[in-house]
């Protein structure tokens, strides 16, 4: 080749300048060295090659003038800290500020990015092909960047000091290049010369991956907890503790005591006679031994042996019946009263859901025979038809017979009337007859029974006369709706028991028709209802009018039954379904160390009533639903329908008559004769449906009510409890259907809680998910009006 020498300096012809860089083809890469070939000698860098003789010398380079000490330099203005902070703040603000990009711009940027990636991949493949690297060693082979064409020079232009431009950029390993010559043959490449960069990148990438995995593990442990892994290893050697293990100096097989000692070879069988028995033997073995002993007695003693054997067998039979194991296995109903243990009484109370408190309280009675009532009274109980006592009767009668003050908390329809009438008759029977002397008639009754409504007072009077007429006691009711002259005439012969409403009794006391000089027994039935109707002040007046000579002491003696029976102290009993604060206030003031009996939980409905709740808004829809219920034939009369306001009673009664059913109404605007006639028509079966307000919700006993419909939900959960208590009485089952609306939000929470506690009722999904049923509402001082009875409530803290 002209002007080209492989191992020496290049010499160009003198007549021709070197070709331009763009006219020459690119220099091919050097071939890879053979394994057997020796590396080329190092280049001689002692002196630069001389320039060609015929070549035109290059123009001399202009020397830069050195600036001396006196030369003026351009003053450099330093950047202030404020300027740097301002620029950084502007850069951060610009980076943090979101930049809106249109869809076209986003597509353009994506296409540009993709084009750059494709271009980079194509360039990488081209370089690998040009360098002769295969795909298997692509990671370890370095990638050489392409040099621009303007920097590719082959022919030297002279010493570096005489060149116009800087030294061209060289590619390839530094060991294969000659610092002064461009065309020196390259040295063989070192295989690990460029692996340092890749190993550093791989190690950095591996460190980042390890850090990411560690962060993920920490986050998982933070939110999901630590994994429960066992550290137990079966292969791990464990040191056995032999500190407490006693090692004999001889082995067990060396023991020869069993060979020569006959005590170990022939064991003696113990024989126990009579009441003796081997531990662990059953009753059958004991019986066989007893019979064996009895036969031995008969054989040895011909005269009295048979008698002794018979007595011994009877004694063994008694012992077996009264054994501790047999008594524990028996149910409380199979045991005798003297065999009842504390555990049996606890089970008995749990069976009847009885809870008592208040000092030394006697155990409940299991049957009428164990009640302690006189024989004459037990005969009357059997004649009336009381077969088994109710839970409140089981618990309250023994306490009342010990002359203790009593607070009975029980649901409606649980037999509370008999629970206070029977102890009252026992108390009065021990007093002198009231008609024995004329002055006794004028001193007033022995006992007073207070009831909140006229209907309840008359109902108690009917129930009391079943017992008082055979015993010769006189019972008089004093209620509103009748003239005072008529009631004064009924008191002319005196009365042992007076059943009255608080308002009318206060009128009689203030008009001197009645005095309470010898009253020694007070019963308040439905005390919470009396407070709700605004009778707290009349009740306080009546209790303050009682004599103080026979008042109980407020000490431990009030809990001593013997001390209370020795002196005729006044006895006070209060029955209620709920315990508001006003009732507790009266109890603290007038009762002395009372025993409290609770059947179930205060304010709960009976378990025999199935409660159904339907969310129906609007009068028309409710009337249509009521017609469907009555026409279904599922429920037999009598049926009670409750409304909230008395003017709706007549409207609902007319609708029911249009449906083909007979109906009567009961509310506060009715006269006493109309009320009695309405209740009588329902009780004797001549009327199918009774439409009433809350007046009939407390204490009215209509037998065999199969259905109660709350056309309007009660304003309080207590009223609702007594409404549905009209059915499911005396152990019978019943159904209560309630129409609920958004206006009843104040009682939804309590209603849902009551339905959840009932084992036979279900909470509808609409009520369960209703907003008002999620938390108990906070109520303030509300003044409410009871339109059904005509009394205005004084208000109470709810």
From Swiss-Prot:
Comp. bias intervals (Basic and acidic residues): 112-128, 763-773, 783-798
UniProt GO MF annotations: ATP binding; ATP hydrolysis activity; nucleic acid binding; RNA helicase activity
Catalytic reaction equation(s): ATP + H2O = ADP + phosphate + H(+)
Biased composition (Polar residues): 132-142
Residue span of motif DEAD box: 525-528
Cellular location(s): Cytoplasm; Nucleus
Keywords recorded for this protein, A-Z: ATP-binding, Cytoplasm, Helicase, Hydrolase, mRNA processing, mRNA splicing, Nucleotide-binding, Nucleus
Pfam families for the chain: DDX23, DEAD, Helicase_C
Span(s) of short sequence motif Q motif: 366-394
Keyword Transmembrane helix recorded: no
Lineage: superkingdom: Eukaryota
GO CC list: cytoplasm; nucleus
Domain Helicase ATP-binding: 397-597
Region of interest (Disordered), ranges: 1-79, 112-212, 761-798
Written domain comment of the UniProt record: The Q motif is unique to and characteristic of the DEAD box family of RNA helicases and controls ATP binding and hydrolysis.
Family: Belongs to the DEAD box helicase family. DDX23/PRP28 subfamily.
Reported function: ATP-dependent RNA helicase involved in mRNA splicing. May destabilize the U1/5'-splice site duplex to permit an effective competition for the 5'-splice site by the U6 snRNA, resulting in the switch between U1 and U6 at the 5'-splice site. May also act to unwind the U4/U6 base-pairing interaction in the U4/U6/U5 snRNP, facilitating the first covalent step of splicing.
Protein name: Pre-mRNA-splicing ATP-dependent RNA helicase prp28
Organism: Aspergillus clavatus (strain ATCC 1007 / CBS 513.65 / DSM 816 / NCTC 3887 / NRRL 1 / QM 1276 / 107)
Organism classification: Eukaryota, Fungi, Dikarya, Ascomycota, Pezizomycotina
């Amino acid at each position: 080749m002209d002007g080209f020498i492989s191992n020496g300096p290049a010499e160009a012809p003198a007549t021709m300048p070197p070709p331009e860089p763009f006219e020459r083809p690119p220099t091919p890469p050097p071939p890879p060295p053979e394994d057997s070939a020796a590396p080329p000698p190092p280049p001689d860098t002692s002196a630069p090659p001389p320039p060609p003789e015929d070549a035109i010398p290059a123009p001399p380079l202009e020397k830069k003038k050195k600036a001396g000490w006196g030369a003026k330099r351009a003053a450099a203005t330093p950047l202030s800290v404020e300027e740097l902070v301002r620029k950084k703040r502007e850069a951060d603000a610009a980076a943090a500020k979101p930049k809106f990009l249109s869809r076209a711009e986003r597509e353009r940027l994506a296409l540009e990015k993709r084009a750059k990636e494709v271009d980079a991949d194509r360039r990488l493949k081209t370089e690998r092909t040009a360098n002769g690297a295969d795909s298997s060693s692509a990671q370890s082979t370095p990638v050489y960047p392409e040099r621009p064409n303007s920097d590719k020079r082959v022919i030297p232009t002279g010493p570096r000091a005489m060149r116009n431009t800087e030294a061209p950029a060289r590619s390839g390993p530094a060991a294969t290049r000659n610092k002064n010559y461009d065309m020196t043959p390259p040295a063989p490449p070192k295989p690990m010369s460029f692996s340092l960069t890749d190993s550093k990148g791989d190690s950095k990438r591996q460190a980042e991956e390890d850090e990411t995995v560690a962060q993920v593990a920490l986050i998982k442990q933070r939110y999901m907890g630590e994994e429960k892994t066992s550290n137990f290893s079966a292969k791990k050697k464990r040191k056995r503790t032999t500190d407490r293990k006693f090692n004999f100096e001889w082995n067990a097989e060396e023991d020869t005591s069993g060979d020569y000692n006959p005590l170990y070879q022939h064991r003696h069988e113990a024989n126990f006679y009579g009441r003796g028995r081997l531990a662990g033997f059953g009753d059958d073995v004991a019986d066989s031994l007893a019979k064996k002993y009895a036969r031995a007695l008969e054989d040895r003693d011909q005269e009295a042996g048979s008698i002794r054997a018979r007595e011994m067998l009877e004694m063994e039979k008694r012992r077996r019946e009264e054994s501790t194991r047999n008594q524990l296995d028996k149910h409380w109903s199979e045991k005798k009263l003297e065999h009842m243990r504390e555990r049996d009484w606890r089970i008995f109370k749990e069976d009847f859901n009885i809870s008592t408190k208040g000092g030394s309280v006697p155990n409940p009675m299991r049957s009428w025979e164990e009640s302690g009532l006189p024989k004459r009274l037990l005969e009357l109980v059997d004649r009336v038809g009381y077969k088994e006592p109710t839970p409140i009767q089981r618990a309250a009668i023994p306490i009342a017979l010990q002359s203790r003050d009593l607070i009975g908390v029980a649901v409606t329809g649980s037999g509370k009337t008999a629970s206070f009438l029977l102890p009252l008759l026992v108390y009065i029977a021990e007093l002198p007859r009231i008609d024995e002397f004329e002055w006794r008639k004028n001193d007033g009754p022995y006992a007073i029974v207070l009831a909140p409504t006229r209907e309840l007072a008359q109902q108690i009077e009917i129930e009391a006369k079943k017992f008082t007429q055979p015993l010769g006691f006189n019972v008089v009711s004093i209620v509103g709706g009748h003239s005072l002259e008529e009631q004064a005439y009924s008191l002319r012969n005196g009365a042992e028991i007076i059943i009255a409403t608080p308002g009318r009794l206060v009128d009689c006391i203030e008009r001197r028709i009645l005095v309470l000089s010898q009253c020694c027994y007070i019963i308040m039935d439905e005390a919470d209802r009396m407070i709700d109707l605004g009778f707290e002040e009349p009740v306080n007046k009546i209790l303050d009018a009682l004599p103080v000579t026979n008042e109980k002491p407020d000490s431990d003696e009030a809990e001593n039954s013997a001390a209370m029976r020795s002196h005729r102290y006044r006895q006070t009993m209060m029955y209620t379904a709920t315990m508001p604060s006003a009732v507790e206030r009266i109890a603290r003031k007038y009762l002395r160390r009372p025993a409290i009996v609770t059947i179930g939980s205060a304010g709960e409905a009976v378990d025999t009533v199935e409660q159904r709740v339907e969310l129906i808004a609007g009068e028309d829809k409710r009337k249509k639903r009521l017609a469907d219920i009555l026409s279904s034939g599922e429920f037999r009369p009598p049926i009670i329908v409750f409304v909230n306001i008395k003017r709706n009673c007549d409207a609902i009664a007319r609708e029911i008559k249009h449906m083909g059913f007979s109906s009567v109404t009961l509310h506060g605007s009715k006269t006493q004769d109309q009320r009695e006639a309405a209740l009588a028509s329902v009780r004797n079966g001549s009327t199918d449906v009774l439409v009433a307000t809350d007046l009939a919700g407390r204490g009215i006993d209509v037998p065999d009510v199969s259905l109660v419909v709350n056309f309007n939900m009660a304003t309080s959960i207590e009223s609702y409890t007594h409404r549905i208590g009209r059915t499911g009485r005396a152990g019978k089952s019943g159904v209560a259907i309630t129409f609920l609306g958004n206006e009843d939000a104040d009682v939804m929470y309590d209603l849902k809680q009551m339905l959840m506690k009932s084992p036979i009722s279900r909470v509808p999904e609409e009520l369960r998910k209703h907003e008002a049923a999620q938390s108990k509402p906070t109520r303030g001082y509300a003044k409410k009006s009871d339109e059904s009875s005509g009394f205005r409530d004084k208000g109470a803290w709810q």
